[in-house]
C-alpha cells in the first residue's frame, strides 16, 4: 500500500520505535527524510542515522537516543502541515513551548528549525513539532 504522507510515516515510525524501546528503526529513503534525520541528529534527538543501499531500495536506519532512565529523548513528535491542510508561517514564527521544543520547517533555505528561520528571516511550511 503506497504511503500518501511520507513525513507522517517517518514521524510515526520514530514514535512507535521509541515507545517499543527499539534501538533502531528503518525508514524508506528520500532526500527530505535524510535532511530531517541530519537535523534531528544535530539537535540531539536521535543518536545517529545511516543511509543503507540494498538491491531493492535504499533506506535510512535511525539509532534512537534514550535518557539514563531509559525514556526516549523524543517526548512528543507531531505532524503539523498535512497534505489536506498545509500550514505555512512567515518569518515571525512563534517559539514552540517557549523555546523548549522545535518546529521543523521546509523553507527556501532547506530543512531548518524555527530558531534558524527567525535568525535568517525566512518562513516556510511547518512540517512537524518535536519536544
Swiss-Prot record:
What this protein is reported to do is described as: One of the primary rRNA binding proteins, it binds directly to 16S rRNA central domain where it helps coordinate assembly of the platform of the 30S subunit.
Q: How does it assemble?
A: Part of the 30S ribosomal subunit. Contacts proteins S5 and S12.
Q: Which HAMAP family match?
A: Ribosomal_uS8_B
Name a single GO biological process: translation
What GO cellular component entries does it have? ribonucleoprotein complex; ribosome
Superkingdom of origin organism: Bacteria
Q: Per UniProt, which keywords does this protein have?
A: Ribonucleoprotein, Ribosomal protein, RNA-binding, rRNA-binding
Q: Name one GO molecular function term.
A: rRNA binding
A Pfam family that this protein carries is Ribosomal_S8
Organism of provenance: Chlorobium luteolum (strain DSM 273 / BCRC 81028 / 2530)
PANTHER family, A to Z:
40S RIBOSOMAL PROTEIN S15A
Q: Which SUPFAM superfamilies match?
A: Ribosomal protein S8
What is the protein's given name? Small ribosomal subunit protein uS8
